[in-house]
Amino acid sequence: MLNKQIMVDADNALAGRQEAMAVEPIHFVNGSDITASATQGQQEILFGMGCFWGAERLFWQLDGVVSTSVGYSGGFTLNPTYQEVCSGQTGHTEVVRVIFDPQVLPLEQLLEKFWERHDPTQGMRQGNDLGTQYRSAIYTFSDQQLDIALASQQAYQAALANQQHNTITTEIRPAGPYFYAETYHQQYLAKNPEGYCGLGGTGVCFPPA
């Protein structure tokens, strides 16, 4: 029986398909084009915090966030479906793609939300959600973003250690391909306000600068 908490390797991952997922491009909440690239002066980053429904809502509510979408990244399968990701055979984690204006919302402030609003010490799970698709992750799009993310990890790890918490397991690395999730999942909690939200946290605040 497949253990969904063990990462599949590239040789054993599902192949996927060449055809990209067709998604509704208009953001259900703010009307932005979720398929658009970051424009000059904007940045993008990918956050994995467990189930992407609650994580996306966290970020679209922030001033300075231009657009959000949910999808799959960090694995091997081309253009996976949700069912394939749930199988544990794609290597992908559920992520939120955040496009933001760093002049309004610096990356450091986004990262504070990231660290505080989920438990980054749980490995291949988040709360009761088990599997590699729920692992904590930050996928960056520049050397500067990577440096800031790694520095924030060190700062939050120190705060966790002071409270006798476990070690951070968050995967932090340059972003690979991002594959949009099905339209059903985009802005899910705006369409289904009583839907499941698995966001939690350790209760440890990010230390002040």
From Swiss-Prot:
InterPro entries: Met_Sox_Rdtase_MsrA_dom (IPR002569), Met_Sox_Rdtase_MsrA_sf (IPR036509), MsrA_MetSO_reductase (IPR050162). Its EC number is 1.8.4.11. The keyword Cytoplasm does not apply. Gene3D superfamilies: Peptide methionine sulphoxide reductase MsrA. Coiled coil: none annotated. It comes from the Bacteria. One of its GO terms (biological process) is cellular response to oxidative stress. One of its GO terms (molecular function) is peptide-methionine (S)-S-oxide reductase activity. Keywords: Oxidoreductase. GO terms for cellular component: cytoplasm. NCBIfam families: msrA. Has an important function as a repair enzyme for proteins that have been inactivated by oxidation. Catalyzes the reversible oxidation-reduction of methionine sulfoxide in proteins to methionine. This is Peptide methionine sulfoxide reductase MsrA. The gene is msrA.
